[in-house]
Amino acid sequence: MGIVERIKEIEAEMARTQKNKATEYHLGQLKAKIAKLRTQLLEPPKGSSGGGDGFEVTKYGHGRVALIGFPSVGKSTLLTMLTGTHSEAASYEFTTLTCIPGVIHYNDTKIQLLDLPGIIEGASEGKGRGRQVIAVAKSSDLVLMVLDASKSEGHRQILTKELEAVGLRLNKRPPQIYFKKKKTGGISFNTTTPLTRIDEKLCYQILHEYKIHNAEVLFREDATVDDFIDVVEGNRKYIKCVYVYNKIDVVGIDDVDRLARQPNSIVISCNLKLNLDRLLARMWDEMGLVRVYSKPQSQQPDFDEPFVLSADRGGCTVEDFCNQVHRTLVKDMKYALVWGTSARHYPQHCGLFHHLEDEDVVQIVKKKVREEGGRGRFKSHSNAPARIADREKKAPLKQ
């Protein structure tokens, strides 16, 4: 029996099992088994060379956005309109057969937009080219799920289920659970909050399913069984997703209003070029990019080429800014002068851990360099004669 058949068999058993207090431990073990099998399903087959016709393209710019959706929902047309890159579009399905990259120039930044082939139901099980598409989505900073407004409800549920099956968690944050494997000592279980959806016995059974007998577990929130399994697996990707409802020109105004009010959603029409500017603004807000302008000493700030930081990738502190400028700037910095939204007054003297906001201006003041062998004194650039104390002392005269 293959992995896919075993997964379907366990899912059928879960569907037959009634959910109550007596069966919750059994259902928790079944969920752990399915998670293990899905992880095995994503692993490359043994003996393979690792090559093949992949979709991965080199990362470019300050962020990456992936277009995911069913075939013929307008992904290629949207890429062409936002980036100017030609992607073949037609009225029939599976027009796009490979990954087509484009670049969006927005707010002095460059954002890479990827047009991925349409995925079908069962993509997480290897149908079509779903695995390759989802692998590229995992490397993105934001997912735009493009949906047909006339049949969006069913498509949205199917796509979300396929992405969840391969470890993508859309619009969720990592659970506040500390988990660490140990070599000895057994399982240490602690919690800082009352648990209502999982207990210590169920955690032991899940860890036993993974053949883990020595570990530290600490719950900092009232998490679920699925949250704990995600932490044990350790390969989940938490990514933001915006649901883009295209082709709103073919549905009624009531349907458009209903779709626009759903969370994390935006309505557009590529045919009428409607609401594309708001889509770009929404992408910018979701990615959380922060532009920081550098100011050399005694010079005007450079507003042409900003340094782009991100809270999701690295951070937005003065230390992160220094690392982008040069890797040795952190140890050479004495303090930073900051102008902008994050500063209380202009300029504000800040340290390495000061959090920067969008369009801040930063000037780095370096430490003075000490002269070699000069007893800790600073280098002097003047032509003044050396002090008497600095001159080489002569040996005393012999009596």
From Swiss-Prot:
Give the residues the record marks as binding GTP.
Answer: 69-76, 115-119, 246-249
Q: Where does it reside?
A: Cytoplasm
Q: In this protein, which residues make up the domain named OBG-type G?
A: 63-288
Q: Could you list the residue ranges that cross the membrane?
A: none
| Record-linked Gene3D superfamilies | 3.10.20.30, 6.10.140.1070
- Sorted UniProt keywords: Cytoplasm, GTP-binding, Nucleotide-binding
Q: Single GO cellular component annotation?
A: mitochondrion
Please tell me whether the keyword GTP-binding is annotated for this protein: yes
Q: Where is this region: Disordered?
A: 372-399
Q: Name one GO molecular function term.
A: mRNA binding
**Chain ranges of the TGS domain:** 288-366
Q: Where is the composition biased (Basic and acidic residues)?
A: 388-399
Q: Which domain of life is it from?
A: Eukaryota
Q: Which family does it belong to?
A: Belongs to the TRAFAC class OBG-HflX-like GTPase superfamily. OBG GTPase family.
Question: PANTHER family, per this entry?
Answer: DEVELOPMENTALLY-REGULATED GTP-BINDING PROTEIN 2
User: Under which name does UniProt file this protein?
Assistant: Developmentally-regulated G-protein 2
Q: Which gene encodes it?
A: DRG2
